[in-house]
């Protein structure tokens, strides 16, 4: 494909040629601004040794710039019509594999092992449909695969929540979950006018750099994330009330009071004020105390 895809003319030409009807249920919004494409590519800092996972390539607006700059590219597209379009448009690139699969169903360890890929050399790029943003990102981060980095276009409000600092209005369970696994940066705000069709909201380009080693050591991740959800379930409650009255996790008031005191926290503090490190320590302290009551020996990190 010689013509630039990420322009109004290039995009409409492909839509007409293949008689494409955009699928609202799949959140299909195609990029038509080459400057935005370049910002994504530049943020990813691609080189010809990189292995790239592209999620939701659509008609190839981003793919067109990824392929010449990467060693191998795996593009996951759920819409079978667009899989055919992509394979025709990029049939000259042997290092590109277009995979017609829902990315939420991918077993990443099996995928990498079957292709002899080292996860540390993999970058993830995507213009993510809004409706699958959180499950896709959390699925990648929770996969125990250490991706090199992720550069993603997401809804602005979601980006703000992912990057939010403790005590801010956007700080919540999603902030903690994403930042638990990696560093988050917001690079650019993107208007609706750079898409066909136009979404109703602004987007942001974010970069997530997963931690190569755990930064926050928690004894039991399942318990930790239940505690986090409980903390943010009713933001206006004190930390103690959140942990003793939530439907997520109901802890003994005495244990919670004792743990808060041991951590040197104000007993009236709201959970939304805690840093992730403080939450990790609190989680380990509570887990230890619960285990003591159960007669088990659980080490605190």
UniProtKB/Swiss-Prot annotation:
Highest taxon, organism lineage: Bacteria
Keyword Cytoplasm applies: yes
Record GO terms (molecular function): 16S rRNA (adenine(1518)-N(6)/adenine(1519)-N(6))-dimethyltransferase activity; RNA binding
Keyword field: Cytoplasm, Methyltransferase, RNA-binding, rRNA processing, S-adenosyl-L-methionine, Transferase
Residues involved in S-adenosyl-L-methionine binding: 29, 31, 56, 77, 102, 127
Biological function: Specifically dimethylates two adjacent adenosines (A1518 and A1519) in the loop of a conserved hairpin near the 3'-end of 16S rRNA in the 30S particle. May play a critical role in biogenesis of 30S subunits.
Protein family membership: Belongs to the class I-like SAM-binding methyltransferase superfamily. rRNA adenine N(6)-methyltransferase family. RsmA subfamily.
Name the record gives this protein: Ribosomal RNA small subunit methyltransferase A
Gene giving rise to this polypeptide: rsmA
